[in-house]
Design a protein with these regions (language model features):
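Short coil/turn segments at the loop-to-beta-strand junctions that recur within blades
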Residues: 62, 101-109, 147-153, 192-196, ...
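Blade/loop signatures of beta-propeller domains
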Residues: 24-58
C-alpha cells in the first residue's frame, strides 16, 4: 500500500523564514550564499584536512573489471564498492571478497544496479534495482526484496528507514520517498515540477555522475536530493527536517531552462546556471561540489574542470570560498605529489575519492607531477590491467 504524508506547507514556511533573513537567528535555517562563496578563492593543501594519503588498488579476479567506481562505503573492515562490475566487497587491503547479487530475474537477482547503501545497524547491503530494493547480508547472501516504485535513483538509510531520491522530472510526483521494511511509503517530499507545463514532449533528463544525494556526519543522515533543489535535509528515520539552504542567486537555474521543459533551450542556454551536486561535512567545513548545468560549448559528454566549482564553507568563520590557487583547484597533494584531491565520499575515518590508472597516468604526464618515492613505486607496478584505485585521505583529529 502506498501511503504518503506530505509536509509541503511546513517546508514552504521554513523556506520563507530562512530566505527572508540571512542570519542565524533562533528558529531560522542557516543559508549559504553561492555568490558570496565565489567571491573568494583560497589555495588549499591536503595537509589542511588529512594526516595521510593512501592509494588502494582494488584487486579482483581476472574476469571482474572493477572500473569506474560510483560509490564507496565502509563497514566491518571491508570496502563496499559500486562499479561497472556491480556491487562488491573488498577487504581492508583491497582484496576481492564477494559480489552482491547478479543480473537476472530470480530471487536476489536484479535487472539494473542503480545504487546501493549499507544499513550499519542491521549490517545489510541494500541494492536499488529498477523497481525494488534487494537486501543481502555482508557476505553476499540474499535475504529479501521489497518494492520501491519505478522512479528512485539514489538511496540512503536512517534507522533502517530507506529514503529514495528521484530525478525530480515533471512526471515524478515526489522528490524523495521514505520506505519501511515492507516497502510501504512513510513520508514523501513533493516534487514542485510534477505535471508542470512544458514546451516540448517534456521527457528530457539531465544528471551528473557526481550527483550524491546523501551523506552522513556524526552518525546523522543528510539528504540533498537533485541539484535543482537548494535545501539540505537532516534525516531522522522517517522525518526529513530542513537543515541548510543554498541561495544560488543569479546562478539559480530557472524552470524554463530545465531539461524536461525545453531540451534545446536547456542545451544552449543553461550553461549560465549552476547546481550543487553533493555535500560533505566535517567539524570545520562543508565540502560543496557544484557543476554548471550544461557545457557552454555543447560538449555535454566531455569532462571539463571549468564546469566545476569546489567550495569549502568554513563553519567557524561563517564564510565560503572556492578552492583555487597557484597550484590549481581542490586540495594540492603535499603528501605523495599526486593529482589534486577532492572528497566524494566519507567513511568516518577517511575522505574517499577514486581514479583509474590510465587517468592517473594522463594527469601525471600533463601536469608534470613528481611523485613521492612510495607512490612512484606503486605506480610502476600498475598498468592497463589495474582496476580502479581508491584514494583515502585519513582525517585529522582535533
Amino acid at each position: 500500500m502506498y501511503k504518503t504524508i506530505h509536509f509541503l506547507p511546513l517546508f514552504l514556511l521554513s523556506l520563507l523564514a530562512a530566505t527572508s533573513c540571512q542570519s542565524d537567528k533562533p528558529g531560522s535555517l542557516k543559508t549559504i550564499s553561492y555568490e558570496s562563496c565565489l567571491a573568494s578563492k583560497r589555495a588549499m593543501h591536503l595537509s589542511d584536512i588529512a594526516d595521510t594519503l593512501i592509494y588502494l588498488e582494488l584487486k579482483a579476479p581476472e574476469d571482474i573489471v572493477a572500473s569506474r567506481v560510483w560509490k564507496v562505503r565502509w563497514i566491518d573492515d571491508r570496502w563496499i564498492v559500486h562499479s561497472i562490475a556491480g556491487v562488491m566487497a573488498f577487504s581492508e587491503d583491497g582484496t576481492y571478497l564477494t559480489t552482491y547479487g547478479r543480473k537476472g530475474g530470480g530471487p536476489g537477482e536484479y535487472t539494473m544496479d542503480n545504487d546501493f547503501e549499507v544499513d550499519t545497524e542491521k549490517k545489510e547491503v541494500i541494492m536499488l534495482d529498477s523497481h525494488q530494493l534487494i537486501y543481502y547480508d555482508l557476505d553476499g547472501h540474499y535475504l529479501r526484496s521489497t518494492n520501491c516504485g519505478e522512479h528512485i535513483s539514489k538511496i540512503g538509510i536512517s534507522h533502517s528507514v530507506v529514503w529514495g531520491c528521484t530525478l525530480s522530472h515533471r512526471t515524478t510526483r515526489d522528490r524523495a520517498v521514505a520506505f519501511d521494511a515492507q516497502g510501504d511509503s512513510l513520508t514523501s517530499i513533493p516534487n514542485p515540477f510534477y505535471m508542470a507545463p512544458c514546451i516540448d514532449a517534456g521527457m528530457g533528463v539531465s544528471t551528473s555522475k557526481y550527483w550524491e544525494s546523501f551523506h552522513t556526519y556524526q552518525d546523522m543522515l543528510y539528504m540533498k536530493t537533485k541539484e535543482d533543489n537548494d535545501t539540505l535535509y537532516q534525516i531522522q528515520g522517517e522525518k526529513a527536517i530542513p537543515y541548510l539552504l543554498f541561495d544560488m542567486g543569479k546562478y539559480k537555474q530557472p524552470m524554463e531552462l530545465q531539461a524536461w521543459y525545453c531540451y534545446e533551450d536547456f542545451l544552449h542556454k543553461a550553461y549560465k546556471y549552476w547546481g550543487i551536486l553533493s555535500v560533505l561535512a566535517d567539524e570545520r567545513y562543508y565540502y560543496l561540489t557544484a557543476q554548471r548545468c550544461t557545457d557552454p560549448d555543447g560538449e555535454i559528454f566531455k569532462h571539463k574542470e571549468s564546469n566545476f566549482h569546489y567550495i569549502l564553507y568554513d563553519k567557524e568563520l561563517d564564510e565560503g570560498f572556492v578552492t583555487d590557487g597557484p597550484e590549481g583547484t581542490r586540495f594540492t597533494d603535499d603528501y605523495l605529489g599526486g593529482p589534486a584531491f577532492w572528497p566524494r565520499w566519507d567513511t568516518g575515518a577517511y575522505f574517499v575519492s577514486t581514479i583509474e590508472w590510465y587517468d592517473l597516468k594522463q594527469l601525471i604526464n600533463e601536469e608534470k607531477l613528481t611523485l613521492s618515492p612510495d607512490l612512484q613505486k606503486q605506480y610502476d607496478e600498475w598498468g592497463y590491467d589495474t582496476n580502479a584505485l581508491l584514494i583515502l585521505a585519513r582525517k585529522k583529529h582535533k
